[in-house]
């Protein structure tokens, strides 16, 4: 084997070999249980980020683990067309390169342009997924707009429409005036900002007066421009100031519209003035109030967010109405919305109706892609009736057909599903699945799989002109069909029969409603088992937290704290990293701050760590459902782990290749250490499998690390040296056999998490075991064997380890050279301790570097010594001639003084109010941690001073 572990040399060639050999495909053995995971489809033109790397590592670990258990495994791969994101990328591209807009191209030509862009950049993310070691079946790769999936989408739309579960209606949506499309709640980013609350007088009609004799109500609003669309004023029905006015009217300033005063809980007596203006067409809460009181809806804005020339007036059901005039005062027409705000305030003030302006903290919704303030907008959209679909989806989780890991996410799911709103599925974009609906000139709507079917079903001759709906479906609509459409539905395919319901879905909790819930609803509606019972899309939902930076901040381009997973695999120089973080920025003014932060964090760029180290780190950090703060030190630690495993394997091979390892018969004697490591290994298998079976990848990674590093490398390899240097033939055979057996099993155990290094080493080790198979990927996963757990060997070895560690600690504390042989005395020995010493003298002397071991008679106190107590005995190392008492005390005093200096420095820092107020919580916690560490170190040094002073 190569002397040094170099992941760059082994990873890519290995992956190509696995893929070429077809090892990622299902084994097709239908006598075995199936295990299937659907990959959450990443954006086709995107690139891999830490969230992908994290989730895909978890999925690949599960898939490899189940594949090694002989299951018929499928990891279904595919990408998402990502409507709005992809369209925006291409729009920006043609604007930058050609100075054109999509309208210059026209719909067909622009869509062709997007397909070109997909062909050009669509392979990036799949190439990156290969670099991660993902064992997905590439031959089954799907795309949400491929022909098969597009047919499934049409089929679902048509069936839901025919069942009256899809309808077209006028409703309020989040409208992005820059992108000119409806967007989902997930694409809205709420930002805190300082604003104003305007208090405006609305004169009472018909001579009415308030309880305190005023002839007006004062309405408080943060959006005075929407006053032009008010159709009511709400007061709380319990409010003594106004309850007698319910049913009376006010005259709306500027427009002179007569609008009713309604009693509604939405008006809070404690907030503002207790009177709230109601604008059902421009506010989500007002829309609901308007529905409750059958108020008309008046839309005053264009799709660009400007004031209309004349308003659109609708009744509460969304039908056009003439209950109010559609006139808008000329001075406000065509004004941009924020200019209109100023103009309305000035006009109200001129009439003497502006009572006061108060500063007010606001939460303002912005579109996360367009970057402008979102406007609630009354538009015609297509909707799915969600309550009917939600009922079985709630029951599936209630009765345990679907389980959430961790369980607490069930509550989040229930709270949303039990109060579900109809789902707006239309988007005013060009890229996506076009809605399969056609209109004739009279405005009648026809829904079908294609125009030909529509004409045939509705007896429409060629003379009837039809135009297809311009809108496309929300990307989440096609994603909701992902578990079954990818397997060939609506055809009843073998794949659907074998792999559906799927086993586990791995997802971030942020899309529990947008994706998880909708998959459950859609799947249960369309997929039934042979008895007609609705099928669930998956049995388990494993929820991951978000990966944040080392300070707990969300990773984002604007913060400049994004780490590309492949930069940790391959390494990246500082100039390249700076270019990546500051090039093509939406907000170039942040570049300087980002540059400084990056230079401080990565002065030499990022070292290459290899894929296995990255995967191990991700698995180790995967504590269920909590957000994860990324830690480069952990990554370095797991890179060191891979080195340690490599070097340990080289040690095993150097001592076993070309030797008799007992695999072809011959007498074998197992030493205590051999019996101990076999027992340890089997206990490790048991605990590790339990962790993987319960989705505790962090615990599994910890178990693997602890056994490999501490038990196998640090102890067992050391404990084999006495046999290797002077054992009998039978003992040598026994130890070599154990070395090879445990290493080979350990490689299989670790393979799901770190596939590349384990396959590479296993190719050498398999020869010694007489295994002829081509790959570790298809080897059986280790099984726990209780007969291998020798309790006596475990107890005896743990005692020996305690004794060796005690001697090593005395050396370290007393500053005695590691190579200097020592005399060991044992006082107050139990029978067990004496037996252990007598049976394992050779081990003890070699590993603790002892000249002699003496068990003192019961009444012998022994000479002046440093002592340690272990189970059933007291260990003594006589100090005569070992140290110079004065020198040692002086050295310790110097150490104590140095540590006291550090302690007072940190205490002063933490006592500084300015520092504590400004510094992030994580920095303060780090300082406190350092302080604790120094205090512990000081206590240990003082203890040592006392021991030496007493000599």
From Swiss-Prot:
Reactions it catalyzes: tRNA(Val) + L-valine + ATP = L-valyl-tRNA(Val) + AMP + diphosphate
Enzyme class: ligase
GO cellular component: cytosol
UniProt keywords, alphabetically: Aminoacyl-tRNA synthetase, ATP-binding, Coiled coil, Cytoplasm, Ligase, Nucleotide-binding, Protein biosynthesis
Record motif 'HIGH' region, residues: 42-52
A Pfam entry, by short name: tRNA-synt_1
Subcellular location: Cytoplasm
One GO MF term: valine-tRNA ligase activity
Enzyme Commission identifier(s): 6.1.1.9
GO biological process: valyl-tRNA aminoacylation
Chain segments annotated as coiled-coil in the UniProt record: 880-944
InterPro entries: aa-tRNA-synth_I_CS (IPR001412), aa-tRNA-synth_Ia (IPR002300), Anticodon_Ia_Val (IPR033705), M/V/L/I-tRNA-synth_anticd-bd (IPR013155), Rossmann-like_a/b/a_fold (IPR014729), tRNA-bd_arm (IPR010978), tRNAsynth_Ia_anticodon-bd (IPR009080), Val-tRNA_synth_C_sf (IPR037118)
PROSITE patterns to which the protein is assigned, alphabetical: AA_TRNA_LIGASE_I
Motif window: 'KMSKS' region: 554-558
Residues binding ATP: 557
Described purpose of this protein according to its UniProt entry: Catalyzes the attachment of valine to tRNA(Val). As ValRS can inadvertently accommodate and process structurally similar amino acids such as threonine, to avoid such errors, it has a 'posttransfer' editing activity that hydrolyzes mischarged Thr-tRNA(Val) in a tRNA-dependent manner.
Entries under PANTHER family matching the protein: VALINE--TRNA LIGASE, CHLOROPLASTIC_MITOCHONDRIAL 2, VALYL-TRNA SYNTHETASES
UniProt record similarity statement: Belongs to the class-I aminoacyl-tRNA synthetase family. ValS type 1 subfamily.
Record comment regarding domains: ValRS has two distinct active sites: one for aminoacylation and one for editing. The misactivated threonine is translocated from the active site to the editing site.
Quaternary structure note: Monomer.
The protein's name in its UniProt record: Valine--tRNA ligase
The organism's taxonomic lineage, starting at the top: Bacteria, Pseudomonadati, Pseudomonadota, Gammaproteobacteria, Enterobacterales
């Amino acid at each position: 084997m190569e002397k040094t572990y170099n992941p760059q040399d082994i990873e890519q060639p290995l992956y190509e070999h696995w893929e070429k050999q077809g090892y990622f495909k299902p084994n097709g053995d239908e006598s075995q249980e199936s295990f299937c995971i659907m990959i959450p489809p990443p954006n086709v033109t995107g690139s891999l980020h830490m969230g992908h790397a994290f989730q895909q590592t978890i999925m690949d670990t599960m898939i490899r683990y189940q594949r090694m258990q002989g299951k018929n495994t499928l990891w279904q791969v595919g990408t998402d067309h990502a409507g709005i994101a992809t369209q925006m990328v291409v729009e920006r591209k043609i604007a930058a390169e050609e100075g054109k807009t999509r309208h210059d191209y026209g719909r067909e030509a622009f869509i062709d342009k997007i397909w070109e862009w997909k062909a050009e950049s669509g392979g990036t993310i799949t190439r990156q997924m290969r670099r991660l070691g993902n064992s997905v079946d590439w031959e089954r790769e799907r795309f949400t707009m491929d022909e098969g999936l597009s047919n499934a989408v049409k089929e679902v739309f048509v069936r839901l429409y025919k069942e009256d579960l899809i309808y077209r209606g006028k409703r309020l949506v989040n409208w992005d005036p820059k992108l000119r499309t409806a967007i989902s709640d997930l694409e809205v980013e709420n930002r805190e900002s300082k604003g104003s609350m305007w208090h405006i007088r609305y004169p009472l009609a018909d001579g009415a007066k308030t309880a305190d004799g005023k002839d007006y109500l004062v309405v408080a609003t943060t959006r005075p421009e929407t006053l032009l669309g008010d159709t009511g004023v709400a007061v709380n029905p319990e409010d003594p100031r106004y309850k007698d006015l319910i049913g009376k009217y006010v005259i709306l300033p500027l427009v002179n519209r007569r609008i009713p005063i309604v009693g509604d809980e939405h008006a809070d007596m404690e907030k503002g003035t207790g009177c709230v203006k109601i604008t059902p067409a421009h506010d989500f809460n007002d829309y609901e109030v308007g529905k409750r009181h059958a108020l008309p809806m008046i839309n005053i804005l264009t799709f660009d967010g400007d004031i209309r020339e004349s308003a659109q007036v609708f009744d509460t059901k969304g039908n056009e109405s003439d209950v109010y005039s559609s006139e808008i005062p000329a001075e406000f027409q065509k004004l941009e919305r924020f200019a209109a705000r100023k103009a309305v305030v000035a006009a109200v003030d001129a009439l003497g109706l502006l009572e006061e302006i108060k500063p007010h903290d606001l939460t303002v919704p912005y579109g996360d892609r367009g970057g402008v303030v979102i406007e609630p907008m009354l538009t015609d959209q297509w909707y799915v009736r969600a309550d009917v679909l939600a009922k079985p989806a709630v029951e599936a989780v209630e009765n345990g057909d679907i389980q959430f890991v961790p369980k607490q996410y069930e509550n989040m799911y229930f709270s949303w599903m039990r109060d579900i709103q109809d789902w707006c599925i239309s988007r005013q974009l060009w890229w996506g699945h076009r809605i399969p609906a056609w209109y004739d000139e009279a405005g009648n709507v026809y829904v079908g799989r294609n125009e030909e079917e529509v004409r045939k079903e509705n007896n429409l001759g060629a003379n009837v002109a039809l135009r297809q709906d311009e809108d496309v479906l929300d990307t989440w609509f096609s994603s909701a069909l992902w578990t079954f459409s990818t397997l060939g539905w609506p055809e009843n395919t073998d794949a659907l029969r074998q792999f559906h319901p799927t086993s586990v879905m791995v997802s971030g909790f942020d899309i529990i409603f947008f994706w998880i819930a909708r998959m459950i609803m859609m799947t249960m509606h369309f997929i039934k088992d042979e008895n007609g019972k609705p099928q669930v899309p998956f049995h388990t939902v494993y929820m991951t937290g978000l990966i944040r930076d080392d300070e707990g901040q969300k990773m984002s381009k604007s913060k400049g704290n994004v780490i590309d997973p492949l930069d940790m695999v391959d390494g990246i120089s500082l100039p390249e990293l700076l270019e990546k973080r500051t090039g093509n920025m939406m907000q170039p003014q942040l570049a300087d701050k980002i540059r400084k932060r990056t230079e401080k964090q990565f002065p030499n760029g990022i070292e290459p760590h290899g894929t296995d180290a990255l995967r191990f780190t991700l698995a180790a950090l995967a504590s269920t459902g909590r957000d994860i703060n990324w830690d480069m030190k952990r990554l370095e630690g797991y890179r060191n782990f891979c080195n340690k495993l490599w070097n340990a394997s080289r040690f095993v091979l150097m001592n076993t290749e070309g030797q008799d390892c007992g695999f072809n018969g011959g007498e074998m004697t197992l030493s205590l250490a051999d019996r101990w490591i076999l027992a340890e290994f089997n206990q490790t298998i048991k605990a590790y499998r339990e962790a993987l079976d319960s989705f505790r990848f962090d615990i599994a990674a910890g178990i693997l690390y602890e056994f490999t590093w501490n038990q196998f490398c640090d102890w067992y390899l050391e404990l084999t040296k006495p046999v290797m240097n002077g054992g009998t033939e039978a003992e040598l055979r026994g130890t070599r056999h154990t070395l090879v057996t445990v290493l080979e099993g350990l490689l299989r155990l670790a393979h799901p998490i770190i596939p590349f290094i384990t396959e590479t080493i296993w190719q050498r080790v398999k020869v010694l075991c007489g295994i002829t198979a081509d790959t570790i990927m298809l080897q059986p996963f280790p099984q726990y064997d209780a007969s291998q757990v020798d309790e006596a060997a475990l107890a005896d070895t743990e005692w020996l380890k305690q004794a060796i560690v005690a001697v090593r600690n005395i050396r370290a504390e007393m500053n005695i050279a590691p190579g200097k042989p020592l005399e060991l005395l044992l006082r107050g020995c139990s029978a067990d301790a004496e037996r252990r010493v007598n049976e394992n003298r050779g081990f003890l002397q070699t590993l603790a570097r002892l000249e002699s071991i003496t068990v003192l008679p019961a009444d012998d106190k022994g000479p002046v010594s440093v002592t340690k107590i272990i189970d059933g005995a007291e260990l003594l190392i006589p100090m005569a001639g070992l140290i110079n008492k004065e020198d040692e005390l002086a050295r310790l005093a110097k150490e104590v003084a140095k540590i006291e200096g550090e302690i007072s420095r940190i205490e002063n820092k933490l006592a500084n109010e300015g520092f504590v107020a400004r510094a992030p919580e994580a920095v303060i916690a780090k300082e406190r941690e350092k302080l604790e560490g120094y205090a512990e170190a000081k206590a240990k040094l003082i203890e040592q001073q006392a021991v030496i002073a007493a000599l």
